[in-house]
Amino acid sequence: MEKTEHKNTYSFDADASKVLNLVIHSLYRHKDVFLRELISNASDALNKLREASYFDQELLEDNPELEILISLNKEKKILEISDNGIGMDEKELVENLGTVARSGTEKFLESLKDKKVDLIGQFGVGFYSVFMVADKVEVETRKAGTKKGYIWGSRGRDSFYVDELGESVSRGTKIRIYLKDNSEEFLDKFKLEHVVVTNSNHIAFPIYLIDEKGEKDQINSASAIWTKNKTEITDEEHQNFFRDVAHVGGKPWMIIHNKNEGSTEYINLLYVPSIKPFDLYNPDRRASVKLYIKKVFITEENVQLIPQYLRFLKGVVDCADLPLNISRETLQYNNALVKIKKSLTNRVLNELKKRADSNPEEYISGFWNNFGAVLKEGLCEAMPTDERERLFALCRFYSLKKEKLISLDEYIQDMHPEQKEIYCLCSTSFESAKNSPQLEGFVSRGLDVLFFTDPVDDFWISVSHEYKSYNIKSITRSSIDLDAFAELEKAGQEVQQHHDKEIDRLIAKMQEVLKDEVESVRISKRLTESPVCLAVPDGAMDIRMEKFMLEQKQLHSRSKKILEINASHPVIGKIIGKVDSPEVEDLIFLLYDQACILQGDEVRNPVRMSKALTRLLLMT
């Protein structure tokens, strides 16, 4: 910075002019942020005075109520932001506003590094964002404890001036903004209120808006309830804040309020709603956890404070410090964010586990029925084994035997002594699952099966297929082995026996007829009441997942399944007697189509099925 011939006029040096031009024209995406930056600076000034007044009460003079004022003059197109904070003397005014990208706050922090003070102006360029909307800016200021005031002025180009104002200036700083023609929107009272409430609602000092009639209204809450001790927050305060951040009805089902004082300092106040948002499964749904830095709103976009599978959470995370880009609009990726995300995830999973253990029924009705499917999305992601196990422990699945939702731990506790796997069945609904022929062999042996009926189940089961050393296995798999489990005795059950040669002839015939449809035909060990079912070869996609992939054009053709037949079923007995008859092919195709329908697979040739059925009906 070089002083010109005029004793009170200064020019920005060449590098500073470049930075200033960048700030005005390129740095910020939204013009609104200038107001956030100026309010943040005002908050810093008030904090400085409050801290300094602990040692010298006279600095408060006769004006101890610390506040920020915003006033407007539509006729002259002037917007003013003022505070009664620490203020600046001539030297500080020249240094702090005359040097772009140099922070007065940084110097003040150095002088008070051993004392706790809350300052949010980190970068020294935020002030200059005002020139996005201003033709000219004037700053009137008087430092607390001094008598002389000064004025700084600039058009945001190459120079600025500083003049003495005498002793008539109030303590603090007043910024007078002469708005550009394209920025007159900031003379609208409702626009100003919206910007302040969005970005600076929780600044610790009251912000008043003074309209042209001189009416003074406080437009911020001047309180960040998350900074209070959790025992000091009333139910009404929680309800009001939840309503503001969640934008959903009802009360919060669970509140998670913690302060982390480790290497990364932050406070979280998170809510789990009691009502499922209508857009929960919208892929474009925005995150609902807002990031603050020292009570100043930063963003709720492009920051992953929580994993996607916890997107039902609402609330705030307030950090002591995080590296932002120079505009404070976006975060720089760093290890602190990773630590915060991991810590928050652990805390939320722990709190959910406590509720699930202490009140299982209320956990299912209040949480799982609303957000269980979203939580299971996490099982599709790559994550540490311990996190996956904790996520599994929160899951609830419908039990065939108990006819209710249970945990995997409950399932394991009641497993057959010889059982080494957790058996499951993916289906579109409870009713279709209950009627699946695949269940028959498990029911006859007293084995429990879990029903997976959410669409997401088809995805995670191929990724997360083990819990506490137990494989989670679909009962549709061809490798399911039930030989180790004895069937329960059924009184009065008649079993039709056939010679091996007769069965072998039928299987050979079926494989010949269905050579283009199935991989193989074999005798089933799982069927007791149905004549046929389909089994999925190991390594192949589950039927429902394959159907989805075909619908999404991710697969071009269906895989061949294994057709299992119940050798003791009367229908199979009749077909054995007709293995050499002309209608045997129609019977075989109908059996295959029946198996497809029962397991949710499409009938590949409905015309063939219709004709075969018609021919057989004509024969009766």
Curated annotation (Swiss-Prot):
Residues 548-620 are annotated as: C. Belongs to the heat shock protein 90 family. NCBIfam families: PRK05218.1. Residues 1-328 are annotated as: A. GO terms for cellular component: cytoplasm. Keywords: ATP-binding, Chaperone, Cytoplasm, Nucleotide-binding, Stress response. The gene is htpG. Pfam families: HATPase_c_3, HSP90. SMART domains: HATPase_c. It comes from the Bacteria. It comes from Neorickettsia sennetsu (strain ATCC VR-367 / Miyayama) (Ehrlichia sennetsu). Residues 329-547 are annotated as: B. Molecular chaperone. Has ATPase activity. This is Chaperone protein HtpG. Disulfide bonds: none annotated. PROSITE patterns: HSP90 (PS00298). Homodimer. It is found in: Cytoplasm. GO terms for molecular function: ATP binding; ATP hydrolysis activity; ATP-dependent protein folding chaperone; unfolded protein binding.
